[in-house]
Amino acid sequence: MKLTLKVETADTAYEVVTNLYVIILWERKYKRKASDMAAGIGVEDLAFMAYEASKLNKIVVPAEFDTFVKGLTNIEVVDTEAVN
């Protein structure tokens, strides 16, 4: 599954797209399966995926996840796409 996430901070707004690697990182960290997303996921889940996808796309983010989260003003799912 690919998610397009809109990330907003006090300074900027941008969109990132997750990939399989980001989803696997999320599964490992939170001990959940991608199929669990159908039942709904939390804001921290979205923030984690946005953080990892940002790093993969060479968007400069803080070294620590919590610092990244503190800087967020909003995060939302713009689009979803099932991986074939």
Cite the ranges covered by each PLM segment.
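Charged interaction scaffolds used for protein-protein
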Residues: 1-14, 18-44, 48-84
